[in-house]
Structure formats: C-alpha cells, structure tokens
Regions:
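Alpha-helical substrate-recognition element adjacent to the catalytic core
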Residues: 1-96
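Short, surface-exposed basic-aromatic patches at helix termini and helix-loop junctions that form
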Residues: 18-21, 43-52, 111-114, 125, ...
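Extended hydrophobic secondary-structure segments that form protein cores and membrane-embedded regions
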Residues: 27-29, 130-136, 162-166
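Short catalytic/ligand-binding loop motif for oxyanion handling, primarily in non-cytosolic enzymes
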Residues: 35-39, 139-143, 172-173
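Alpha-helical scaffold elements lining the catalytic groove of polysaccharide deacetylases
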Residues: 92-112
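Conserved Lys-Pro-Asp/Glu-containing loop-to-beta segment of HAD-superfamily phosphomonoesterases
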Residues: 105-138
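Acidic, divalent-metal-coordinating active-site segment for phosphoryl/phosphodiester hydrolysis
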Residues: 135-149
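C-terminal accessory extensions appended to soluble enzyme cores
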Residues: 143, 157-182
C-alpha cells in the first residue's frame, strides 16, 4: 500500500494495469519468496487503490459475469523462491537459481493460456495470442529471449512473444523484443 500511496510503481505498471482492465490472463513471476496469496491480495489492493470507477467498470464488463475476485483467482502467481513454487515444480530453480525458475513459470503460464485460447480459435474476433514477459534484470531478459527462441517458439509457433527489458524504467518501449515465427 505504501508504494501505491507514494506513486512508486514498477516499470511495467502501465502495461500490467492495461492487462487487468482488459481482463487478460496474466502471471506474476518474481524472484521474491512471498506466498502466491500475498501477490494475489496485492493485485486486488492495486486495483482498489489505482483504478477509477470507470476503469473498474470497464474491467467488469470485460470479465463477462465474473467478479474481480474470481478473475484474480484464475491467474498465476509464481514467487519462485517460495515454498509453494518448490512444492509445485520441484527443487529446480527456486532461490538458488531464480532465472531457471522463471523460465519454468513462463512455460507453465504459456501452456495454460494456449490451452485456454483453443476455445477461441473459431471466433472471428480472435486475432491470435501474445505472451509478454518483462524483467529488470538483464540476465533474466537474455535467458527469457533464449528460452522463448529455443523452446517456447518450437512448442507454440503461432504465439507472438514479447520480452520487455525494464532495467531502465525510462526506456522500456525501446527495449521491447518481439519473437514470432519467421
């Protein structure tokens, strides 16, 4: 709450808020060790404190009958240093190797949204699927680019992947890498 009250947002805040307003699926993948519930609860606080009434209504309209709480419960929260992450995915990665753990979480999220999008393929309004990943650590950005290019693009050739380097919060747009089929 203090960061919100101080207006101290992360470099991807506007993109995250946009995803929330449109009711897009998302995953919070962080090296931190708090519980997934803490991330979910924090997201709810963020909505409550930063969304105008109009933005909340737009979000509810996009959720087609689901409540904000139901929507948030369907999303992925992967603090890769948490006990919950280790229980779900095993010892690989975690606090000892958060870069690898983040790729495991990204693969899990991508698999979930690709499976969910299969229901939309016949819908004329469906324009395809994009998955975005942002990080403020250049090592994680490079590893994500490599992982997407070598593994995820082979498994999901029709998905458009975007990687955002947020190491310089003033220059996130210029550091957007698009990885799609050639």
């Amino acid at each position: 709450k203090k960061a919100i009250e101080d207006g101290s947002y992360g470099p991807s805040f506007s993109k995250f808020k946009e995803a929330l307003k449109y009711g897009n699926d998302f995953s919070i993948i962080t090296a931190r060790g708090q519980s997934p519930k803490a991330l979910k609860d924090g997201t709810k606080v963020l909505i409550d404190m930063t969304f105008s009434d109009e933005e909340k209504q737009m979000m509810l309209d996009r959720l087609r009958g689901s409540s904000i709480d139901e929507y948030l419960s369907l999303q992925d929260y992967h603090p890769v240093s948490s006990d919950e992450f280790k229980e779900k995915f095993g010892a690989e990665g975690g606090a000892e190797n958060p870069e690898i753990a983040k790729t495991i979480a990204l693969k899990d999220f991508t698999s979930r949204v690709v499976d969910a999008a299969k229901e939309l393929e016949g819908n004329p309004e469906f324009n395809g699927l994009s998955v975005g990943f942002s990080d403020d650590d250049l090592k994680n950005v490079e590893l994500a680019k490599e992982f997407i290019g070598k593994e995820l693009k082979n498994s999901y050739p029709n998905v458009r992947f975007l990687v955002y380097d947020t190491s310089d919060p003033k220059d996130t747009k210029k550091k957007r890498i698009v990885i799609q089929k050639s």
